[in-house]
C-alpha cells in the first residue's frame, strides 16, 4: 500500500478502484474514531460500527422508504423549488435576470427537506433562517481533519451551535414525540426524532442531538456541494456540446442523472481520504493490517484509476462508462456497511421512481438559463480541499 500525501494523514492507503471498494466493504474496518469531533458527532451513526451501527441503521431505514422518498420529492422539494424561483421575481435588480449565490440558494431549498426529515416542528421563515446559522459551524466539525482553522475553536463553535439547535428546535419536538410514544405511539409520518424518541431506541438526549446534527449537515452539505459542482461542470460541458442542453432539460432522459453521477466521481463532496481502523487483525488488498491500525481509502485516487477510467479520468464526461465491470461508478457515498444512508435523497431511487434532489434542482437552474456571474468572486471554504461557499450565478426571472 502507498503512503498518504497530506501530512496530516500519514497512514497507509489504498488507491486503486478495486482495493478502495474492498477496504470500504471490509467488516473488520471501522470508521476511525474522531476524538476532536467527539463532542459533536461521537455517538452519531457515522461513528458507529458493528451491531450498534446495524441496529441504528435498521431503525432509521424507514426514513428512506419509497413512500418517504416520494413524499419528500413531491410534497416538499417540488413546491419549494417552484416557490424559491418564483420569489426571485420580487428582487429589485435586473428586470430580466436575478443574481443568486448558488450554494446558499440550494442550502435553503434542501433545508426544507432536512427539517421534515429530522422532524422539527417549527418551520416558519424565521425558524429556517435560525437553523441555517447552525449549519456552517457543524460542517466545520464534520470536516475538522481537513480544516485550515484552529480545531479547538472550530469544535467549540460547533458544540455551541449543536447546543442551541437542541434547545431551540430539537428538544421541544423530541419531547412531544416521547409523550406520543408513551400514550400509544407516534401516528404521524416517521421522522428522525420520532425514531429516536421510541422507548426501544435506547437513545439518550446527547446522542439524539448528535444524530440530528449529523442529519442536518449531511443532508444539506452533500446535496449543496453536489448541485453546485454539477451546475458548474454541466455548464462547461454544454458550452462544448450545446445540443446536450436539451437533454439536461428533458425529464424523460437519464442524461442529467448521469451528469450528477459523473460530477460525484470527478468532485466527490466527501473527504478525499476515508479513514478506517482495524477492529481485528485483517488483510486489505493482500496486505496484513494489525488490530488497531489505521488505513485509508483514497477516494480521489480511486476515481482516477486508469484501469477503470483510462481516458482522461480528471475530465467531466457524462457519456463515459467504466472500462471494466464495477459494483458502482464512484465511492462518493462510500460502500459496504457504511454506504451513506441518505444516498437515495440525492440521486433518487428506482423503487420509489424518484430522480433525487440533485437532478431536480440542477434541471430547475438550467430551465432558468443559469449563467456564471463574472462580476462577483467565487469563494471557497477554509479547508484543504475545494468546496464552494460562494458561487455567483444569474438566472432568468419568470414573469
Per-region residue spans from a language model:
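Conserved cytochrome P450 K-helix/beta-meander segment immediately N-terminal to the heme-binding cysteine loop
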Residues: 28, 298-325, 333
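Cytochrome P450 heme-thiolate monooxygenase catalytic core
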Residues: 71-225
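Short, mixed-charge aromatic SLiMs
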Residues: 130-147, 250-259, 321-324, 380-389
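Cytochrome P450 catalytic-core helices
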Residues: 209-214, 220-248, 342-369
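Conserved cytochrome P450 K-helix E-x-x-R motif and the immediately C-terminal K′/meander segment
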Residues: 249-287
Amino acid at each position: 500500500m502507498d503512503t498518504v500525501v497530506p501530512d496530516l494523514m500519514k497512514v497507509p492507503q489504498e488507491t486503486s478502484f478495486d482495493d478502495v471498494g474492498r477496504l470500504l466493504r471490509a467488516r473488520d474496518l471501522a470508521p476511525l474514531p474522531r476524538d476532536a469531533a467527539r463532542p459533536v458527532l461521537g455517538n452519531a451513526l457515522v461513528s458507529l460500527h458493528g451491531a450498534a451501527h446495524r441496529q441504528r441503521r435498521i431503525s432509521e431505514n424507514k426514513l428512506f422508504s419509497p413512500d418517504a422518498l416520494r413524499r419528500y420529492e413531491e410534497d416538499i422539494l417540488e413546491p419549494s423549488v417552484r416557490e424559491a424561483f418564483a420569489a426571485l421575481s420580487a428582487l429589485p435588480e435586473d428586470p430580466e435576470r436575478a443574481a443568486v449565490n448558488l450554494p446558499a440558494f440550494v442550502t435553503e431549498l434542501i433545508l426544507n427537506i432536512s427539517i421534515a426529515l429530522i422532524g422539527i416542528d417549527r418551520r416558519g421563515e424565521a425558524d429556517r433562517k435560525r437553523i441555517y446559522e447552525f449549519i456552517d459551524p457543524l460542517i466545520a466539525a464534520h470536516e475538522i481533519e481537513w480544516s485550515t482553522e484552529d480545531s479547538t475553536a472550530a469544535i467549540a463553535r460547533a458544540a455551541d451551535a449543536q447546543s442551541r439547535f437542541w434547545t431551540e428546535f430539537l428538544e421541544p419536538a423530541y419531547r412531544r414525540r416521547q409523550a406520543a410514544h408513551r400514550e400509544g405511539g407516534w401516528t404521524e409520518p416517521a421522522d428522525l426524532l420520532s425514531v429516536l424518541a421510541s422507548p426501544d431506541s435506547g437513545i439518550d438526549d446527547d446522542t439524539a442531538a448528535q444524530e440530528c446534527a449529523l442529519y442536518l449537515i449531511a443532508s444539506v452539505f452533500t446535496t449543496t456541494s453536489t448541485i453546485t459542482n454539477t451546475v458548474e461542470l454541466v455548464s462547461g460541458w454544454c458550452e462544448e456540446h450545446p445540443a446536450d442542453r436539451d437533454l439536461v432539460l428533458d425529464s424523460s432522459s437519464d442524461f442529467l442523472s448521469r451528469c450528477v453521477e459523473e460530477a460525484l466521481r470527478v468532485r466527490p463532496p466527501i473527504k478525499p481520504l476515508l479513514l478506517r481502523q482495524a477492529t481485528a487483525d485483517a488483510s486489505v488488498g493482500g496486505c496484513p493490517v494489525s488490530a488497531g491500525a489505521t488505513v485509508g481509502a483514497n477516494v480521489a485516487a480511486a476515481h482516477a484509476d486508469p484501469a477503470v477510467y483510462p481516458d482522461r479520468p480528471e475530465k467531466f464526461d457524462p457519456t463515459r462508462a467504466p472500462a471494466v465491470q464495477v459494483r458502482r461508478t464512484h465511492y462518493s457515498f462510500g460502500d459496504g456497511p457504511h454506504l451513506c444512508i441518505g444516498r437515495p435523497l440525492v440521486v433518487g431511487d428506482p423503487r420509489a421512481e424518484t430522480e433525487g434532489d440533485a437532478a431536480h434542482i440542477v434541471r430547475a437552474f438550467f430551465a432558468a438559463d443559469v449563467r456564471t456571474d463574472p462580476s462577483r468572486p467565487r469563494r471557497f471554504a477554509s479547508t484543504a480541499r475545494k468546496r464552494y461557499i460562494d458561487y455567483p450565478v444569474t438566472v432568468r426571472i419568470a414573469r
